[in-house]
Amino acid sequence: MENFNMPRSTTFYALGLSYKKADAVIRGKFSLDAQAQSDLLLQAKAEGIESLVVTSTCNRTEIYGFAHHPYELIKLLCENSNGSIEEFQQAAYIYKNEEAVSHMFRVGTGLDSQILGDFEIISQIKTAFNNSKQEGLVNTFLDRLVNTVIQASKKVKTETKISSGATSVSFASVQYIIRNVADIGSKNILLFGTGKIGRNTCENLVKHTKNSHITLINRTKNKAELLAGKLNVIVKDYADLKQELHQADVLVVATGAQNPTIDKASLALQKPLLILDLSIPRNVDANVEEIPGVTLIHLDALSQITDDTLERRKQHIPAAEAIIDDMKLELNTWVNGRKCAPTIHALKSKLNDIVSAEFAFQKKKITHFDDAQMDLISSRIIQKLTNHFASHLKNENTSVDQSIEFIEKIFQIGQLAPNKTSSPIADKYKINLS
């Protein structure tokens, strides 16, 4: 039987920082770009971490993985980001075992998103999962857990209305612009950066402002051109950024840089400028606010905008939580099955030994003993008996550990079953980690 090969003291953890306790500056320090995530995985592998997934978005940076102590994972995060242990302690959270599993379900189904019902995080989890899998850092439990969370996310999205209505960071950005800039249709709008949020914001700008003066600039021009071709907006070279800044009425910054790309020195303004910084880490230096007429709005302020759509979404939280409970029960059933399998296998072997011994005894006493018929009958009886035991062990109301101990004592099969390893995850999820 496949096993996890887990050390005795290994625990499953979910730890990180999110918008709930960490502001944009702190989240920026712990933000991990693609290279940093790759480096973290390689370091984890070198340090003997068997299974781990790392995600980093504008709203959260998290690690899900197995370790002897959470510090092993915290160390990985701090050594591959610009954050310190002290900063982590002040703003982070650490969950273990059952709580860690529950946290991943809430994150993956949009219940823990900064904007309720925003499912963008599940695509990040999928990408992170695939990256870890390529490095051989996904064990059987984490594989099953992530796939169950993905299924739960799909069910919540399709079977509830928790994501109904237009509510996202990009939508909130455009609504803020419309509410705060008069005659928006005639203003010059500059979008700097065409990542996921940048693309979505551009689409919303075109759709809701009816503005024909939207300009895109990206360090890699062909990415901007691909987006511009779909939306019929203007593309300019990165070299033209300073000139375009001079002409802009509204600037939306959505680059993926690790340091500010816009600062006071970049701007030589002769009219008011509204700047929306949708980046983590922040890509607009706070010193731009020293310039008269400049208004700087950051991602977190936009995410706090609530409206009727969000209130309607909240009504569907109970339905989403019911789906999560069902999927967690399904996961737990699978885990129970993995734990009881060695005992069931040993029980079947013990019953076969009893039958074989009885056959050998009876063949000496019974003339014309029919081996084939007795093999068929005994096999069917043994299968039915083991099925009954397996069904009992997999029942959600069964105390699996006590039942396994009872079966092993009655049939004296403790030595036949593989040695079981105790660990917190085994205790919580009744899973065999031998």
Swiss-Prot record:
Residues binding substrate, per UniProt: 57-60, 113, 118-120, 124
Enzyme Commission number(s) of this protein: 1.2.1.70
Substrates-to-products reaction catalysed: (S)-4-amino-5-oxopentanoate + tRNA(Glu) + NADP(+) = L-glutamyl-tRNA(Glu) + NADPH + H(+)
Keywords: NADP, Oxidoreductase, Porphyrin biosynthesis
InterPro entries named in the record: 4pyrrol_synth_GluRdtase (IPR000343), 4pyrrol_synth_GluRdtase_dimer (IPR015896), 4pyrrol_synth_GluRdtase_N (IPR015895), GluRdtase_CS (IPR018214), GluRdtase_dimer_dom_sf (IPR036453), GluRdtase_N_sf (IPR036343), NAD(P)-bd_dom_sf (IPR036291), Shikm_DH/Glu-tRNA_Rdtase (IPR006151)
GO molecular function terms attached to this record: glutamyl-tRNA reductase activity; NADP binding
NCBIfam families: hemA
Protein name as catalogued: Glutamyl-tRNA reductase 2
Protein species of origin: Flavobacterium johnsoniae (strain ATCC 17061 / DSM 2064 / JCM 8514 / BCRC 14874 / CCUG 350202 / NBRC 14942 / NCIMB 11054 / UW101) (Cytophaga johnsonae)
Gene: hemA2
